[in-house]
């Protein structure tokens, strides 16, 4: 019996491999795979259900139908193993060989492989240097191809129509030249091709050509020819002589009841090929007329095309149900294809699924598992235990016992389940916290009980969500689940490093309620010796929960890592807070909880606890908080009632005033004073402001109540209104929702995003009228539609991110680089959004950090910034710190842990083997889905940002300007004429506390270095228009202003002023098409001296007259701004996708290509010529479209990379002109802006990791002495490595420039073709990989999952290291043995001589 088992083991031996190579298969190779030729199109005999001999399911070719039994039944059982039956020809072996044995068809005529023909760029076309159209004409028998011109004037590879061919035959005779049709002709040309000669010719041609187009073409061909030479692929193998046939069990034929069969589409496609092939062979035998043979050959070509890739050329072959048949290509591509359906994701056979309910008494690491479910899931363990206990003699008996559910089974189940972790998973699993391990507690009922605190990580709620349970079977799996995945070990969020097990909703409400204070309560003023005494007093009804009392508390301080008691002190507090302090861990200050505990406070508490105590304390504290929160929220009796929604009395008056203002503006519009756009904008502004006012009045009314104190005085304190408490505590609802309940709903958006100018003045408590209800439906529906669409978009973004980052793993401790990124505090307007301390927390310094204004070192180079350091950085007011970053890491494969810094989810330096690429992708993608789902929470209420028209500072300080260019106007104010100016306010320590952007045309009321005080207005501007400012005093001359043709003259009825409006170019008459209206500024006294010219866009308004004199800083024209649209997250998700795809915006900004002085050259019809002359006299020309507004003027000095014309930034330009660091800062800043807008906190690290992957490629500018071709793209790491080698050999180095690739492109351009093929464009990737003979070294995670090995990350990282070490050791041993044997032989030979 043992030996038999050994035989089974031998059959399943797998070979170890380190790489996979893909290439073209030669006819010999295909025949070597095959176990026999398939000659007939028959499948199986419908009576006997046995496969037909030499048919598509032939047992002789593909193997036996049943294990160890030949087809005719002569040989059965194991003893005839590997015997070939002489009667039916079937080998006696396992039936599973039918899944791996291939067959083949000998084709009667060669056939071109459609992938190499039609997959762009066409490899055949490129190699033969012919157009795809021409090759197709030859292949499908429409034209002849000259394969050997002989001595005739015909040219090699010339195309001849039938007429031309016969003419040539008549003229030269058929012995003089050779011309063929079909794949045969192509094959002849390819087999005659001498690749080395071709490569040499191409190199010579590319050196001799001046044409860029030709050079590109030569380089493309040279690359293909070189790759064919290197890979050993022969070009003629792109044409098939032998067609391989898939093993029969991979294209099954299943008999259904009623004598019908279900079959794989491939069988139909193979049948067509075999039928046509047999017919062609017969025709050739019979020597049929050429035209019939040709037609049959064409049909064979088409049949093979549709087998390999149906529908790629011509119409797809349909099945009998009128849908295209699924070809081999369709089998592997797309979501249902082999890669994504079966290799990257598989269904699990050991799992359960049920609804989840709340388990408020569970500990954090526990879950409640229904007994019924546990019994099914733990069956193998129960059987085993029953047998070892001797309760059941066989598995069968054990099975019976379990089925009958006898009492001892339940006892054994208890024992089996004890401390055996199970995995819980909630779909969609957006990040790794979507699967966590818990210890099961057996419960009655059929629902899984889940700990409320892990709901945040799973994004679960108890409104009918379902979860799946998986059982880790092996001991290694159990160990990993317990140490790495247990819920109590995953306390921090991997995106931001903040606690994720934060209590919410009821728990927060309970804690908030118990820690609120109230005056004039029973027991006010009592003094308690400790918290227990306070609890006893509360439970004996001597004091109320909110009474103000005094409490003696014990403080702790840290000694040798332990908290020891220190002084005692008395604090003013409330009874509730005293009770809460009983669960506070030693070492957490009472001051942290001596306030009404809202969600923010709880979050901070857990954070501080995690940082100061160990993990276990934190988890226990969170659990205790939860139990207490539930207890007191029950006692509070807080409910939701319509009387709690108090409508402010002043509301009616506010709305009345707003209506009067709107009426005024309407009148101004009807008189023609303002344009419709301006009217609309102003109306929106009025209603937005009113909405805010009503909301404020409502919050004042709901948020405060009058209470009488002990002395009988009335005091205004925070109210105990239920709705207010829910929102204020952060338990549920928000001020935005409260304003809709009892303020006014405000402005609504149309489905296209524009705001409807009639707001909803009612709220939900008053109720909506028909019209208002109808307007509301827009928002509600748009919310739902958006959610559905954006969820898909967000999922796709995550998928692309995972794909680009999947092979990035921490591979070493320190790469030793000095490079890094410079971090600064992020300041937006008057708020510090992110302090420098927070930004650098958990990062490693790249150079010494000095104390401000001294040379004393504060942090040494290579120091990991801790929490204490981070606080100190903020205190000291350090401006900027250079930290290590994964973008600048020098590790060849992966990233080193010093460049990455802290592991966000663990709070210590990241370990080797962590898959940081996938973590980054999940961290960025997960909130994407959250954001998309957030749209309908405010019910579509359009929160239109009221137009900002001035800068008012919040703090006292000194004003400093950056990039400010200005001119002084008549009133001695500064008028800003630069586009990227900013003003910063620094406090008395010199720390930057506020930063504002100043738009072009703004008026500034403070000088550089001037002192400002809080509330000062330092700048203002018109928010509704873009002005064009005159930079010198002078006279205005209008050019091409022709009334009725290029401009219209209008009069403002209110002011009586006239103004010009442009007529859009599209609407002008033919006569006016050539006219270009512009304003010239000339010297006041001399019209010949032109100071400047201003081209005008079509939407402009001009309030000047011709020849008018204007002062410097005057407004020449105004361009009205667009109507205000709601800023929904629509800006968000597509914006993030655009940034990561590195898309160029349509009208992107134009940056200066060099540093120097600007001048303007001769412009062309549509473009201006801008010349930058450097100090060395080198001129750089830039051509800029006339419609782009150029922000620079003649004679101005400009730096390389400065903005010349406004617009969204182009990341490719930033990389090219300003470098990698500038690009990294730009992408990080822009992505963070989107997420910050939604209040999502993501660490910069994750974005940097993705940017690193986008910068993987370089373009070779000069290949030096390397094997690269100029203009080729190559992997950055490979080029650096090669440069080291070239430098060591004293050869010419490679000159390159970094390329920025979008994530999709970067995923497809990865070194691993398996990973790229499983992502997108499968056929294109595989075609390219096979022609170039690509080798996949299986570095990334995806490739390893696909080939079924442990991933080289986490615990698998060590496994692969050990495997490689063993491999190297075995090779070394073999080498040493061989050397020893050789030296022994030599010795022997010497001795003999």
UniProtKB/Swiss-Prot annotation:
Cofactor(s) demanded: Mg(2+); Zn(2+)
Sorted UniProt keywords: DNA-directed RNA polymerase, Magnesium, Metal-binding, Nucleotidyltransferase, Transcription, Transferase, Zinc
Family the entry assigns: Belongs to the RNA polymerase beta' chain family.
Listed InterPro entries: DNA-dir_RpoC_beta_prime (IPR045867), DNA-dir_RpoC_beta_prime_bact (IPR012754), RNA_pol_asu (IPR000722), RNA_pol_N (IPR006592), RNA_pol_Rpb1_1 (IPR007080), RNA_pol_Rpb1_3 (IPR007066), RNA_pol_Rpb1_3_sf (IPR042102), RNA_pol_Rpb1_4 (IPR007083)
A cellular component term, taken from the record's GO annotations: DNA-directed RNA polymerase complex
Entry's Gene Ontology molecular function annotations: DNA binding; DNA-directed RNA polymerase activity; magnesium ion binding; zinc ion binding
Protein name per its UniProtKB record: DNA-directed RNA polymerase subunit beta'
Binding positions (Mg(2+)): 461, 463, 465
EC primary class: transferase
Pfam families xrefs: RNA_pol_Rpb1_1, RNA_pol_Rpb1_2, RNA_pol_Rpb1_3, RNA_pol_Rpb1_4, RNA_pol_Rpb1_5
Bound cofactor: record note: Binds 1 Mg(2+) ion per subunit.
GO BP term, example: DNA-templated transcription
Function of the molecule: DNA-dependent RNA polymerase catalyzes the transcription of DNA into RNA using the four ribonucleoside triphosphates as substrates.
NCBIfam families, per database record: rpoC_TIGR (TIGR02386)
PANTHER family according to UniProt: DNA-DIRECTED RNA POLYMERASE (PTHR19376), DNA-DIRECTED RNA POLYMERASE SUBUNIT BETA (PTHR19376:SF54)
Recorded catalytic activity of this chain's protein: RNA(n) + a ribonucleoside 5'-triphosphate = RNA(n+1) + diphosphate
Binding site for Zn(2+) 1: 70, 72, 85, 88
